[in-house]
Swiss-Prot record:
Pfam families documented for this protein: NTP_transferase
Assembly information from the UniProt record: Homotetramer.
Listed name of the protein: Glucose-1-phosphate thymidylyltransferase
CDD domains reported in the protein's UniProt record: G1P_TT_short (cd02538)
Assigned protein family: Belongs to the glucose-1-phosphate thymidylyltransferase family.
Length: 288
């Protein structure tokens, strides 16, 4: 399975902060925002990853992440010339995806929860259809919304409806079989001129191959698209890390625990950051 991180967009809701820098490069406590969605792909066992950025930000992402070898993965890059919809990622990434299945994660989404790694690996193991994740929110009109019947089976999906049929939002994490590329090519722009991911999900729903997994108690899904939510996300990460004495979305640790980095490579990377808490945390891992 291949992985795609969509890190484009103009971040207008975060102006003036994002006038000079990509939203996905902003810090969320002690790491760049993009570390969090990248960690999701790595926890799912995905090592071949495409990062799609706005044209003006591509070089900055390359400078931060490189070719991925420091994290035991392979990272390539592409650009989205203009923010024409999430589903456009599959058209941009068609050659990268090839004949593989694909997982798309949005560059400004943060996930945390018990047994999340197991949940991800189960979704990645599916060879047919699509898997998306639903989470209860206070403001469903801001998101794609999934409606369930009395048996809690998905019956409809709408993108940012004025009158939501439920308070279950579809999160920014999607697993698809290889048909996603051809399905995306069939989409027509919505009223707001975008290729909507909800329309793609609806195609899977209509042919009976969409699985909607619930992220319930014990899970946190954080959308960092506003000043308030960005601050809340940083506070959440700080609190969890301080209480549990672990780091969320520590890419080097994930790679090391997955067997993708040797002890020697982890120590080498940690030494370059030994003067801060992040590097010291990596060094402590080697002593346990």
């Amino acid at each position: 399975m291949k992985g795609i991180i969509l890190a484009g967009g103009s971040g207008t809701r975060l102006y003036p902060i994002t006038r000079g820098v990509s939203k996905q490069l902003l810090p969320v406590y002690d790491k760049p925002m993009i570390y969090y969605p990248l960690s999701v792909l790595m926890l799912a066992g995905i090592r071949d990853i495409l990062v799609i950025t706005a044209p003006e930000d591509n070089a900055s992402f390359k400078r931060l992440l490189g070719d991925g070898s420091d994290f035991g993965i392979s990272i390539s890059y592409a650009v989205q010339p203009s923010p024409d919809g999430l589903a456009q990622a599959f058209i941009i990434g068609e050659e990268f995806i090839g004949n593989d299945n694909v997982c798309l994660v949005l560059g400004d989404n943060i996930f945390y929860g018990q047994s999340f790694t197991q949940t991800l690996k189960q979704a990645a193991a599916q060879t047919h259809g699509a898997t998306v994740f639903a989470y209860q929110v206070k403001n469903p009109e801001r998101f794609g919304v999934v409606e369930f019947n009395e048996n809690f089976r998905a019956v409809s999906i709408e993108e940012k409806p004025q009158r939501p049929k439920s308070d279950w939002a579809v999160t920014g994490l999607y697993f698809y079989d290889n048909r996603a590329v051809e399905f995306a090519k069939q989409l027509k722009p919505s009223a707001r001129g975008e290729l909507e991911i909800s329309d793609l999900n609806r195609m899977y729903l209509e042919d009976g191959s969409l699985s909607v997994q619930i992220l319930g108690r014990g899970f946190a899904w954080l959308d960092t698209g506003t000043h308030e939510s960005l601050h809340e996300a940083a506070s959440f990460v700080q609190t969890v890390q301080n209480i549990q004495n672990l780091h969320i979305a520590c890419l080097e640790e994930i790679a090391w625990r997955n067997g993708w980095l040797s002890d020697e490579k982890l120590e080498e990377l940690a030494r370059t950051m030994a003067k801060n808490q992040y590097g010291q945390y990596l060094l402590r891992l080697l002593k346990k």
